[in-house]
A protein has these predicted regions:
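A short, histidine- and acid-enriched strand-loop-helix "catalytic/donor-clamping" loop
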Residues: 92-97, 113-130, 144
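Donor nucleotide-sugar binding/catalytic pocket of nucleotide-sugar-dependent glycosyltransferases
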Residues: 140-178
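Structural alpha-helical scaffold elements that stabilize or flank donor/cofactor-binding regions
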Residues: 81, 137-138
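Glycine-rich, highly charged phosphate/nucleotide-binding loops
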Residues: 66-79
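An aromatic- and histidine-rich active-site surface loop
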Residues: 71, 87-111
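A short helix->loop->beta-strand "cap" motif at the edges of active sites that frequently abuts
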Residues: 111-114, 163
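N-terminal subdomain of nucleotide-sugar transferases
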Residues: 2-58, 112
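Conserved donor-binding/catalytic core segment of Leloir-type glycosyltransferases
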Residues: 22-24, 178-181
């Protein structure tokens, strides 16, 4: 009984809060990777209101570019027309994913929104040394960085000087029965 009450309260709070969050990330409706699976599970099990704009996906470079451009334009429209959106939660990785996400970080900050950058990239340390000043400047524009483990949190604390850093482990399987959100 207590679990049901807690789930009900969490669902109410989450419905109210989740309507203020705009998520940016890869195509996730038919997940083919870790980030897509996390986003799919967020929509299905965690957030009652899942405002999401897809910024990557496609089978060739032209399709990928068009997806990024259309995602950027859609985000600008949402931020212009929906004053309820307070937080932009951007899922990213390394290399091209991070470069693409940097544009979305800049746009969100231009509209005065809080930015949560959720970094999934296992190769981020290798990527960081390719352009540390620019990458650090993007990271430091964010209000919060979400990492997947304590070791990643410690790493990001050494290369940033501003954003809060939090750990949120990936959810890759549906929650157990009984306290489903």
């Amino acid at each position: 009984m207590q679990c049901q009450i807690l789930c009900f309260i969490f669902k109410m709070l989450t419905r109210k809060i989740s309507g203020h969050i705009l998520t940016i990330g890869c195509e996730y409706r038919h997940p083919k990777g870790g980030v897509a699976q996390v986003m799919y599970n967020y929509e299905k099990y965690v957030f009652p209101v899942f405002n999401c704009i897809v910024n990557s996906g496609g089978t060739n470079n032209v399709a990928k570019l068009l997806k990024a451009i259309s995602g950027y334009l859609l985000m600008a429209i949402h931020l212009t027309t929906d004053s309820h959106l307070r937080i932009v939660h951007i899922h990213t990785s390394s290399y091209n994913s991070f470069k693409r996400s940097a544009y979305f970080v800049r746009l969100a900050k231009a509209f005065g929104r809080k930015v949560v950058l959720h970094i999934h990239g296992g190769d981020f340390k290798k990527y960081y040394v390719t352009n540390p000043k620019w990458i650090a400047s993007v990271l430091n524009r964010c209000d919060m960085i979400v990492t997947l483990s304590e070791s990643w949190k410690n790493y990001f604390q050494t290369i940033t000087n501003g954003p809060q850093i939090r750990i949120v482990e990936n959810i890759v399987a549906p929650p157990q029965e009984g306290c489903q959100l």
